[in-house]
Amino acid sequence: MRIMGLDVGSKTVGVAISDPLGFTAQGLEIIKIDEEKAEFGFTRLEELVKQYQVEQFVIGLPKNMNNTNSPRVDASITYGNHIEHLFGLPVHYQDERLTTVEAERMLIEQADISRGKRKKVIDKLAAQLILQNYLNRNF
């Protein structure tokens, strides 16, 4: 069963996919979106869903450190509701506190990637971490 992980931001959506057995997550790509123009990347997402035969989604919830909802939580849930409606597939949510910080740390310490290059891959890596955390917790 393939699960797609998403890190939803206001300008990009990081995308990750699980292996067929649901053990590991791999970053796929970053989809550019524009909330103000109501462009949410659903066409590209549909292509990926078909290509990887996705059966469910995991979307990161950007909670605050004190476990309250950040302003982006509502946007992530709204995005999840759209996906559930468009694809008819279940959507789960995963606390994503510190995943972007962890992703940035990994890119600096392990890959020694410059700031400019980090911006191009950080959302994809964050989506991978969100999905891997979900897989570790549920499978």
UniProtKB/Swiss-Prot annotation:
The reply on keyword Hydrolase is yes
Its lineage reads: Bacteria, Bacillati, Bacillota, Bacilli, Lactobacillales
Q: Which Pfam families match?
A: RuvX (PF03652)
Q: What is this protein called?
A: Putative pre-16S rRNA nuclease
What is this enzyme's class at the first EC digit?
hydrolase
Q: Where in the cell is it found?
A: Cytoplasm
EC number(s) given by UniProt: 3.1.-.-
GO CC field: cytosol
